Structures are given as structure tokens and as C-alpha cells.
Curated annotation (Swiss-Prot):
Phylogenetic lineage: Eukaryota, Fungi, Dikarya, Ascomycota, Pezizomycotina
Gene Ontology cellular component terms for the protein in this record: endoplasmic reticulum membrane
Protein name as it appears in the record: GPI ethanolamine phosphate transferase 1
Keyword flag Protein biosynthesis: no
GO MF annotation, one: mannose-ethanolamine phosphotransferase activity
Ranges per topology, Lumenal: 30-463, 517-518, 582-586, 634-637, 703-715, 776-822, 887-895, 954-996
Length: 996
């Protein structure tokens, strides 16, 4: 495809996949925020006030519901009695048993701090992409409880408080924060919570002296927000089952008790409502973000003015309990679960302010100490806020649609929202409060359904467009492969006037509909790619026909047809099994076990000739199969880190000892080559850097485990070792050794120190086994090609091309054949394994931050995330280098196999696109998002790996190249001698003539 050479194909691949990754956010996770709504609150007579004059919100960041309410031994026992399990939050527990109402607040994905706080305080669920905005100052630019309050005072983290302070009415919210340097994962995080409690005490001490402040604190409709980050930081550092985390719960409970008593002593009016909850939970491996139940279940304890007393069921199990709360010893107290956004509605009601404009929370009536009439009024106001959002959204949708399809329950056959609200008002006026509450609850569900209907209004059109786009990419990629790497550009594209008019008309029609609908700019991108891809495929239809003859021309008998169909079904089955492997990691183990027998399919003669190589492949596959059987959620294991690092050092030392054997393709018969002493010295330095990384990592890990912090010297040396090791390949340019095995070792040792520093358990062993598997794969594929080519006569499809004026490729590159599909499939499986063998496929959050603390102990999500990405990229770097060498050994173009994989990989992407969920269990939602994003990014990685591969193998020589060069030199000398002899004869003949 002369018009679209290789580098343009790669650029198109990257742009297309990045654009289409965001399609799930335009389809499934559109921001629900709207403006222009009227606000509603419960109207009361002048002589009646709100349930509470003030509200105190405690958010224990990262606190799991079970850990808060279970019984545990004393974290730091001083006597045998301390070993007896007891509640670690006795004050909060007393509120559950005596004064308030409790339950579990269920969060949504992503289970991160910003989305969690937005749901709690604004009552809405931001779209999933908003999680990244929580890592930088990005004001919450929509309505919230704080914005509705008369005034809000807040204390806590600089990552959370400024968002609400700067997003509210100027001067409405005061935020008191500690510095970012306090968020040190290597220090005692309880100091963060103690800082908050101490500053609240100082604040009220100042109020006793400051008359202006005291008057402000005596107003109604005020809110106090205490953000307690210590639990989250401790959970990340030590895990939520650790004594440090449990001790932090004790400190939080004591702090809440002291603050509650402070309010009681200061106000002495009993008009304060207290809410204690969390923004998200924490997984057993110290992370959050996905939809695992440990991350989505948080405690909710409410007590004080306007709050219902506990409902007790002595001697029996109270309603609301299940297996999850069986060990809390609270079975006799009714448990009232809520969705996280419901908390915002509850707090708004208690303090007597309007419900936030975009709130979708349902007011939990079971938490209210109100009579039935008050509950009926509150329910109606709650549903009016939802219906107001529906009205505004519907008006905007009508304005951009040629033919609007109304929501059926509110359509021609259903009652309008206004009519149904009027009916509920009549029920309240008639004193039929129970019926009014039931009707409000039913209308609430219909209203939320209407909001969802409008949210998903464009789904069918967009999903069809994206699907056609992905199918177009697959067809375009495979067409490009056939044109470039099978036909070598011999067939020119054939465009017709009719075809051009057709595709242009389709694009114009799509864009016209998008303009009328006032669609976002991203929609135009989604519409462009399908038309572009399918037009390219149509223009190269003759290439496809010629490619079919080249690739399938030899399939002309019943047996060959059956073999082709069977192999095709097998390959499709493997790809489908990889989709299941995203959920069940064990499937990758099965694939490796099956793949270990691949050399046996070539017969005994092949095994006899390549016995050692086949055995290496078999053992490497079996070893690789074990990693996906190990738990993805792993704790730090310094001994395993050390063992992995030592084995990396052993590999480097063995190479230095047996260099001649390795460079002779593992043969003892070859003559020893001249030693490149500079190159060997550099290998020794790389081995030394790996040893240094082991020492530093072990020291840093033990220091952090002992809670002694990260020594400054260790941090500096860790960075020096990491950077120096990554720069070492530049030194080899002084006197390069271009043998492919030497190049592979250099890359292996380049990444080894980084992998040691950033590993927490068995990942170092994976790095070793994975590297061994890749090397044996490169050698085995070459051996198979030589073996099969020596047995089978060459056909037109297998001959190496000669240089012709028609070919767009240089002579060394042979055309692809059907047999290369297996090589591409192996490459694809190895890509999946590179990511999944050490991580939980369903949860990106399973990649622990423990290793990053050895370099960056202070909370810095972008830098820490970059370190994790660097670690994840190392196996991909190994694959790219080995595949580049394999391309050379097989004689195919550098981009050929990359492009094949880029085409077939989106079969997985398209599958995961259709199974993305935005409702259901939070685990399902988070998993489907992760699956789609990972599958999409893998294709982007492949497109990026080709230039990486080219850089890694620049100038590298495989065995055949060296032999050809030597043969070429001999041939040149022979030709020179022949020419000299001929010239001598000619000149001799001429001289004789003259003399005569």
C-alpha cells in the first residue's frame, strides 16, 4: 500500500485506538451534570426548624465497613487480656447500639477519593473518567451540600478540601489543610488524623475568644467536614488487616468521641447531627479503585439531632443483616443499607438546606426521627428534585433531535411528571401519608429510569458506529498486511467514481446528523474512521483477491481444506480463550501447558536434532504456567525478591564464563571468537548494578517494614541505580558486539535492576522464566523453519523474493505465509502473559504500591503511577526485542508480524466493548471497564513496540547474516581474481599483437 507506508499505518493505529478507548466514556459514562434546575427543600412553618442546626461529617478515607465493626485483639497488646477480640471503635459502636442508625453505604466505581466524596457531598456519581481529576486541583464545579449550607468549615487533606472550597460560592467554604509532605507512606499516618482533631479543638478554643467566630458558629444550616486520610495511607502501606490499620481505627474512634464531646460542651443544645462514613474501602492487598466488594462497602453511622434511634430485635436476627455482617455482633440491631449518593440527601434534609441540584440520592427515611407526615413531605421534595433534572435533560435532548422518542412512562400513554406530583400532593393533603410515601418511592424509580433513558438515548447509534469502526480497522489492517507483506505492493489500489461518491455520501450524511444533534467533537472522529477504513478496503479489493491466491492457492484438496478449517477454528478458539483468560487467569496456564508440546508436532527427527532446545522450551512453558496459578494479590516478600535478583546475577555471570558457547548458538564445536573486552567489562558493570539493586532494595524494604522510614541514602542510590542501568546500553556504542544473543543479554541486564527495585514478590522469578521462554521461542521458530524448508520443496509462496522493480521491499524479506499466522498467535499469547502473569486481570488496582515507596515515599500519584507503568512495560520491551530478532531470523519484514497482531487483537477489544456494563454489581462494572481498556491499550502497545524493537535490534546480526557476509567476502575475492586474470589475458594478447 504505497500511499500508506508502515509508519503511517502505525500512526493511524495509535490515533484510532486512543480515540476509540474514550468511546466507552461517551457511551457508558457520560457526565450527568446539568445546569438550570430549580432547587427544592422541605417547607416548614415559621415555628418549626430543621431537624438539626448543624451537621458534622466525618469521612474515614479508605475505611472498610467490616474492619470498622468487627472485633479484633488489641493491635499492640500489653497483657494476655489484650489478646481477647474486642470492638476497636467502641464509641461509634455505642452510637449504633444506643443513639443512632447504621448500615453499609455502597459506593460505585471508580472507588477513588474524588468520586467518593462527590457522591457523599453532592449526591451524584461522576463519570468514570473524573477519577483522574482527583489527582490535581480541579474544583467541583457543580452544586453540593457545602454550597447549599450557610457556611462550611473543613479540615484535612490538600487533595480533597480545595476542590470543594474553590468550587463553591466564594467565601462559603473554609478549608484548613496540612502540607503535601505530611502524606508520607513511610511514616506514621495516624499523625494526619491527629492533626485534624487537634486543629478542630484549636478552632473551637479560638471561638471561645473570638466573638465574631462564635456568632458565625451559632448560626443554623452550617456544616463541619473532617477528612481523615490516615486510614487510607496506613492501608496502602501496611494493608487493612495490619495492626497499624486496626490501631488507626482506634485513634479515629477516640478522635470522633473527643470532637463529639467538644460540640456537646460548646453548644449545649442537642441540635447537632453527626454522620460518620467513608469515601471508599480498601482491598486486602492495600489498594482500591475497582469494584471489589471490599472497596465498595463502607460504614455509615448517623446519630444526633433529627436521627432515628436504633431498631432493636432482642434474641433474633434483625432485618438487613447477611453473611457479611454476621461477625459484627450487631445482629439484633437493624441494618439499613444505602447507596453512597443517598448520604447527601440525608445530610441536606437533616441540616435543612435544599437538595443539591444534580443529586440522584434517595432520602433514606429509616434514618429520620420524624413523624409520618414529615417523611411524606420529604419524600415528595426528594422526587421533585429528580423530576426537575429529568425536565431539563429532556428539553435539551428535544432541542437536538429531529424526531424525539419520549420516555414511555412519561409519554402519551403515561401520566406526566406534573400530574403524578399533583396526585401525591393530594394524598398528603388528605392525610394518606403511607400511600404518598409509596407513590413517591415509585415515582422516584420512574424518574431515575427516565434520567437513565436520556443518558442512554444515543447508545444504539454510537455502539453500531463503534462496532463498524473496529471491524473496519481489522479489515484495513489485514488488507494492509496482504498488500505490503504478501504481495509486496504489486497490486495498485483501484478507486472508482461510484465508490468515491458512495463513501463521501455516507460521511456527509453522518456528519449532517451529528451537526443537527449538536454532538461532541469526538462523535465526528468516531464517524470518520469506519468510512475511512472501509473505503481503503474497497480500494484494495484486487489486492485481497490476489492475496487469496498467494496464501490459499495451495489448498486444493479435501485434506488440505480440512486442515485449513481445523487450524482456523483452533486459532479462533485460542483467541476466544484469551478473552475468558481476562476473568480466569488459569486459562493462560492451560495454554502454556498445551504450547509446551508444540515441538513434538514436528516428529521424532526434529526432536532428535533439537532435543536440548525442545526441552528448554518445554520446561520454560511449564514454569510459565505456574505464575497464573499463583495469587495475583501478593504481599511483600523480601526473600523472593532477593532470590529473583540473585538468579539474574547468576545469568550474567554464566554468560561471561560461557560467552563463546552462547555466541556459537550453544555449540561446543565452533571456534572461539576474539574477545571484546570492553563489551565484557560493560556486562560486568551491569551485573554489579543488579547486585547493588538487590542490596538497596532489601535494605529499603526492611526499613519500611520496621516503620523506620526510607533512608535518604537508600532513596538516592535507588534512583542512581535505576537511571544508570537504563542508560548502560549507550556505553556499548563505543565498541558494539552485534551478536543477537549478546544483544538480548544486554537488554535483560538493562531492565534487571529496575525489576528488582520495583518488585514485591515473585515478579523477579517471572522475569527470568519469561526471558528464557522468549529466547527459546526465537531459536525454536528458526529451527522449525529450517527443518520444514529442508523437507518441503519450495513453492511460489515460500521462495525468498529477488529484487524486482515491482517489489517495494528489499530482497532479504520473504512474503508472509499461512504458517506465519502461528508465529503471530504465539506473539499475541506472550503479550497477554506479559501483563497478566503477575497481575489480576480484572483489577488494575492489584498492582501494589509497596515497591514504589522505595523510590517515592510521599504521595504523588502521577510519579508513582509512572513507576508502575515502567515496571509493566519491561516485559513488553523484552518481547519487542526478541520478536525483532525473530523477524530477522525468519526473513520477514520487521513490521509484518506486528501488523498481523494489531489486526487480530481487536477481536478481543470488540468483544469487551460489547460487555462493558454501567450498572449491576460494582465488581462487574469495574472489571468490564478494565478489560476493555487493557485490550485496547495492548494494541497501542503493539504499535509502539515496533519502533522500540527497531531501536533495540539496530545493527544486530543473526547467525545467517554473519555466514552470508563471510561467503560474500570470499565471493568478492574470487570475482576479483577472475577479473584480474581476464584483464591479464586481454592485456597480454594485445601486447603480443603489437610486438609482432
Amino acid at each position: 500500500m504505497a500511499a500508506f507506508p508502515r509508519f503511517r499505518f502505525l500512526a493511524i493505529a495509535v490515533i484510532f485506538h486512543f480515540a476509540y478507548i474514550f468511546s466507552i466514556f461517551d457511551i457508558y459514562f457520560v457526565s450527568p451534570i446539568e445546569t438550570g434546575m430549580r432547587l427544592f427543600n422541605v417547607q416548614r412553618p415559621p415555628n418549626r426548624s430543621a431537624p438539626a442546626d448543624r451537621l458534622v461529617l466525618f469521612v474515614g478515607d479508605g475505611l472498610r465497613a467490616d474492619k470498622a465493626l468487627q472485633s479484633h485483639p488489641e493491635p499492640y497488646p500489653k497483657s494476655d487480656a489484650d489478646l481477647t477480640p474486642r470492638p476497636l471503635a467502641p464509641y461509634l459502636r455505642s452510637k449504633i447500639l444506643e443513639q443512632g442508625t447504621f448500615g453499609v453505604s455502597h459506593t460505585r466505581v471508580p472507588t477513588e477519593s474524588r468520586p467518593g466524596h462527590v457522591a457523599l457531598i453532592a449526591g451524584l456519581y461522576e463519570d468514570v473518567s473524573a477519577v483522574t481529576t482527583g489527582w490535581k486541583l480541579n474544583p467541583v464545579n457543580f452544586d453540593s451540600l457545602f454550597n447549599r449550607s450557610r457556611h462550611t468549615w473543613s479540615w484535612g487533606s490538600p487533595d480533597i478540601l480545595p476542590m470543594f472550597e474553590q468550587g463553591a460560592v466564594p467565601g462559603r467554604v473554609d478549608a484548613y489543610t496540612y502540607g503535601h509532605e505530611f502524606e508520607d507512606f513511610s511514616s506514621d499516618a495516624t499523625q494526619l488524623d491527629l492533626w485534624v482533631f487537634d486543629h478542630v479543638k484549636d478552632f473551637f478554643a479560638e471561638a471561645r475568644r473570638n466573638k465574631t467566630l462564635a456568632e458565625a458558629l451559632r448560626q443554623d444550616k452550617i456544616v463541619f467536614f473532617l477528612h481523615l486520610l490516615g486510614l487510607d495511607t496506613t492501608g496502602h502501606s501496611y494493608r487493612p488487616y495490619s495492626k497499624e490499620y486496626l490501631n488507626n481505627i482506634k485513634i479515629v474512634d477516640q478522635g470522633v468521641k473527643e470532637v463529639a464531646e467538644l460540640f456537646r460542651d460548646f453548644y449545649r443544645d442537642g441540635r447537632t447531627a453527626f454522620v460518620f462514613t467513608a469515601d471508599h474501602g480498601m482491598s486486602d492487598w492495600g489498594s482500591h479503585g475497582d469494584g471489589h466488594p471490599d472497596n465498595t462497602r463502607t460504614p455509615l453511622i448517623v446519630w444526633g439531632s433529627g436521627v432515628a434511634k436504633p431498631q432493636l430485635y432482642p434474641g433474633e436476627v434483625a432485618p438487613g443483616h447477611d453473611e457479611y455482617s454476621a461477625d459484627w455482633n450487631l445482629d439484633h440491631v437493624r441494618r439499613h443499607d444505602v447507596a453512597q449518593a443517598d448520604v447527601a440527601a440525608l445530610m441536606s434534609y437533616l441540616v435543612g438546606v435544599e437538595f443539591p441540584a444534580n443529586s440522584v440520592g434517595e432520602l433514606p427515611l429509616s434514618y429520620l426521627a420524624a413523624d409520618i407526615k414529615e417523611k411524606a413531605e420529604a419524600s415528595l421534595v426528594n422526587v421533585q428534585g429528580i423530576l426537575e433534572q429529568y425536565r431539563v435533560k429532556e428539553e435539551k435532548k428535544k432541542a437536538t433531535e429531529l424526531k424525539y422518542r419520549p420516555y414511555q412512562p412519561f409519554g402519551e400513554n403515561g401520566l406526566s411528571p406534573e400530574r403524578r406530583v399533583a396526585e401525591i400532593r393530594q394524598l398528603i393533603d388528605a392525610g394518606r401519608y403511607e400511600e404518598a410515601i409509596e407513590e413517591s418511592a415509585a415515582l422516584m424509580k420512574v424518574g431515575l429510569g427516565g434520567l437513565r433513558y436520556l443518558q442512554t438515548y444515543d447508545w444504539l447509534f454510537l455502539r453500531a458506529l463503534i462496532t463498524i469502526g473496529y471491524l473496519g480497522w481489522i479489515a484495513y489492517a489485514l488488507t494492509t498486511v496482504v498488500d505490503l507483506h504478501v504481495l509486496h505492493g504489486r497490486v495498485r489500489p483501484s478507486r472508482t467514481l461510484g465508490g468515491g461518491l458512495f463513501f463521501t455520501s455516507v460521511l456527509v450524511a453522518l456528519y449532517a446528523s451529528l451537526v443537527i444533534s449538536k454532538s461532541p467533537l469526538t462523535y465526528y472522529v468516531y464517524a470518520f474512521f469506519p468510512v475511512f477504513f472501509w473505503e481503503e478496503v474497497y480500494a484494495h479489493r484486487e489486492s485481497l483477491a490476489a492475496g487469496r491466491k498467494e496464501l490459499l492457492g495451495h489448498i486444493n484438496s479435501g485434506g488440505s481444506v480440512a486442515s485449513f478449517v481445523l487450524n482456523s477454528a483452533l486459532y479462533v478458539g485460542v483467541i476466544e480463550s484469551l478473552a475468558l483468560g481476562y476473568i480466569h487467569r488459569e486459562i493462560l496456564s492451560v495454554l502454556f501447558v498445551l504450547g509446551s508440546f508444540w515441538p513434538f508436532t514436528h516428529g521424532l527427527s526434529f526432536l532428535k536434532k533439537h532435543g536440548a532446545l525442545s526441552a528448554t522450551w518445554f520446561l520454560a512453558c511449564i514454569a510459565m504456567s505456574t505464575f497464573t496459578l499463583l495469587p495475583a494479590m501478593k504481599a511483600e516478600n523480601v526473600n523472593l525478591i532477593t532470590i529473583g535478583g540473585v538468579l539474574m546475577v547468576v545469568i550474567g555471570l554464566l554468560y561471561l564464563i560461557f560467552e563463546d558457547f552462547v555466541l556459537a548458538d550453544f555449540s561446543w564445536n565452533a571456534k572461539p571468537t576474539s574477545r571484546n573486552h570492553l563489551s565484557r567489562s560493560l556486562v560486568g558493570i551491569q551485573v554489579g548494578l543488579t547486585v547493588l539493586s538487590i542490596i538497596i532494595t532489601r535494605s529499603s524494604a526492611l526499613s519500611l517494614q520496621a516503620k523506620q522510614g526510607l533512608p535518604r541514602g537508600n532513596q538516592i542510590m535507588g534512583w542512581v541505580t535505576l537511571v544508570a542501568s537504563l542508560l548502560m546500553p549507550l556505553a556499548y556504542r563505543l565498541r558494539p558486539n552485534n551478536h543477537y544473543m549478546h544483544r538480548i543479554l544486554v537488554i535483560f541486564l538493562t531492565c534487571a535492576p529496575t525489576f528488582v527495585i520495583l518488585t514485591i514478590s515473585y515478579e523477579g522469578l517471572f522475569y527470568l522464566v519469561f526471558s528464557a521462554l522468549l529466547v527459546s521461542w526465537v531459536r525454536l521458530e528458526h529451527a522449525v523453519q529450517k527443518f520444514t524448508s529442508s523437507k518441503a520443496p519450495q513453492t511460489a509462496a515460500t521462495k525468498k523474493p529477488t529484487t524486482t522493480t515491482e517489489s517495494h521491499l528489499p530482497a532479504p524479506f520473504r512474503p508472509l505465509t499461512l504458517h506465519d499466522a502461528r508465529v503471530a498467535l504465539f506473539f499475541f499469547i506472550l503479550l497477554q502473559s506479559a501483563f497478566f502473569s503477575t497481575g489480576n486481570v480484572a483489577s488494575v488496582s492489584s498492582f501494589s504500591l509497596d515497591s514504589v515507596y522505595r523510590l517515592i515515599p510521599i504521595f504523588d500519584p502521577f510519579s508513582q503511577g509512572a513507576m508502575l507503568i515502567l515496571k509493566l512495560m519491561i516485559p513488553f520491551a523484552l518481547i519487542s526485542a526478541n520478536l525483532g530478532i525473530l523477524n530477522k531470523r525468519l526473513g520477514v519484514a520487521p513490521s509484518a508480524l506486528f501488523m498481523v497482531v494489531m489486526g487480530i487483537s481487536d477481536i478481543l477489544t470488540l468483544y469487551f466493548f460489547w460487555v462493558v456494563k454501567d450498572e449491576g454489581s460494582w465488581l462487574e462494572i469495574g472489571s468490564t471497564i478494565s478489560h476493555f481498556v487493557i485490550a485496547s491499550l495492548l494494541c497501542v502497545f503493539v504499535s509502539a513496540l515496533e519502533p522500540v524493537s527497531a531501536a533495540f535490534i539496530a545493527g544486530v546480526e543473526v547467525g545467517e547474516e554473519s555466514e552470508l557476509k563471510e561467503e560474500g567476502k570470499v565471493a568478492e575475492k574470487v570475482v576479483e581474481k577472475v577479473n584480474e586474470a581476464v584483464e591479464g589475458l586481454v592485456s597480454g594478447g594485445d601486447g603480443g599483437g603489437d610486438e609482432s
